[in-house]
């Protein structure tokens, strides 16, 4: 059965939980992971790499993220209120297809729902990213991505918020 691992934290967690519910209503298993610090995960992983490089005769150290995700299956989607570069810093240690949504672009003054839709981190965009990742991974054949874009009411012709 297809499975999605959703990463979220802080105020975006509500969007991630709603996306999980929407995925599960479609028969797609979804686990939610609370990421309190992408920077700390990155630093820990880099420290382990350094240790392993400098101590080749010692037992290798495993990064915390590898310990947590090492046995997980499925695809991974990170949704963040920060730029995509922040969650992307842990990409080398993600054991599957990894899709990142973030708020790249210039600031706007709007209500949260409008901003989340504008920056493509709303539950609908998280669901789309998850199902697209499953389709790209060959794990899901029940819903075409183009049909889902239409169903979710996403305007695919809208400008990229990072460039708008």
Task: Go through each PLM region and give its residues.
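Thiamine diphosphate
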Residues: 1-164
């Amino acid at each position: 059965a297809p499975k999605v691992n959703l990463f979220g934290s802080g105020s975006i967690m509500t969007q991630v939980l709603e996306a999980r519910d929407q995925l599960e209503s479609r028969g797609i298993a979804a686990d939610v992971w609370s990421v309190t610090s992408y920077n700390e995960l990155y630093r820990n992983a880099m420290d382990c790499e350094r240790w392993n490089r400098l101590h080749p005769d010692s037992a290798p150290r495993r990064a915390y993220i590898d310990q947590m995700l090492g046995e997980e299956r499925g695809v991974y989607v990170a949704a963040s209120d920060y730029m995509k570069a922040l969650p992307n810093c842990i990409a080398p240690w993600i054991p599957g297809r990894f899709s990142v949504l973030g708020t790249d672009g210039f600031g706007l003054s709007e209500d949260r729902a409008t901003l989340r839709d504008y920056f493509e981190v709303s539950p609908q965009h998280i669901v789309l990213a998850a199902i697209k990742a499953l389709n790209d991974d060959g794990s899901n054949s029940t819903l075409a991505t183009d049909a889902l874009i239409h169903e979710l009411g996403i305007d695919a012709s809208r400008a990229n918020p990072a460039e708008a």
